Amino acid sequence: MNDWMPIAKEYDPLKAGSIDGTDEDPHDRAVWRAMLARYVPNKGVIGDPLLTLFVARLNLQTKEDKLKEVFSRYGDIRRLRLVRDLVTGFSKGYAFIEYKEERAVIKAYRDADGLVIDQHEIFVDYELERTLKGWIPRRLGGGLGGKKESGQLRFGGRDRPFRKPINLPVVKNDLYREGKRERRERSRSRERHWDSRTRDRDHDRGREKRWQEREPTRVWPDNDWERERDFRDDRIKGREKKERGK
């Protein structure tokens, strides 16, 4: 955790495919392809890579003159190359701009990213092909950034920096504390339920006691008890006579 950086200092296809750079296994075939790829930067590319910017998400109608007009505000431009399709000659939507001075590169990197040119919000980053060790281009499953719709997001660059990894010990402690809190709440709930049941029983006992106090146990006098017994016996004898007479 102490050496965590949002921007990759060295390109690792496996880490680039992970939102926090901690994946241990590739999650798609493109990552596998990038891990197996061996890429050598184009030696035919000229210019100082440390003074060169990568400009992407350009309107396909944007021309070199427009780019020069915008980016010359930050300093003197030595070279500007708008990448075009070799067959059709149409723009591919990205360019490389080399400045004469480092301060111009830094200023353009800081201020030009997110500018709107010909109704398109552009993306500006340093050139990575010749400056980032281990670089693998997107066509081989690597690259950085990307759109969600493409399903091939790559992290560790300016467009999509790594997110800080979750501190697992902290998470475990939080879960432990949460579990203890839930157990305490359940215990309190049981205690409240038990107290409620106890109060109900006490209430019932009290009500029964009050009823008993209001209605004392009936005590039969001896003569009343004898009359009740004689009355019951007479009813039984009368029923027997009636049944014999049928």
UniProtKB/Swiss-Prot annotation:
Where can this protein be found? Nucleus
Q: In which tissues is it expressed?
A: Expressed in heart, liver, skeletal muscle and pancreas.
InterPro entries named among the record's database cross-references: Nucleotide-bd_a/b_plait_sf, RBD_domain_sf, RRM_dom, snRNP35_RRM, U1_U11-U12_snRNP_70-35kDa
Q: Name one Pfam family in it.
A: RRM_1
For this UniProt entry, what's an example GO CC term? nucleolus
Q: Which SUPFAM superfamilies match?
A: RNA-binding domain, RBD
**Biological process annotations from GO:** mRNA splicing, via spliceosome; RNA splicing
Q: Where is the RRM domain?
A: 51-129
Question: What are the boundaries of the region Disordered?
Answer: 187-217
Q: Which UniProt keywords apply?
A: Isopeptide bond, mRNA processing, mRNA splicing, Nucleus, RNA-binding, Spliceosome, Ubl conjugation
Residue ranges, compositional bias (Basic and acidic residues): 192-217
* Organism, as annotated: Homo sapiens (Human)
An example molecular function term from Gene Ontology annotations: mRNA binding
Residues joined by cross-link Glycyl lysine isopeptide (Lys-Gly) (interchain with G-Cter in SUMO2): 172
Query: Assembly and interactions?
Result: Component of the U11/U12 snRNPs that are part of the U12-type spliceosome.
Q: Which PANTHER family match?
A: U1 SMALL NUCLEAR RIBONUCLEOPROTEIN 70 KD (PTHR13952), U11_U12 SMALL NUCLEAR RIBONUCLEOPROTEIN 35 KDA PROTEIN (PTHR13952:SF6)
- For this entry, the protein name equals U11/U12 small nuclear ribonucleoprotein 35 kDa protein
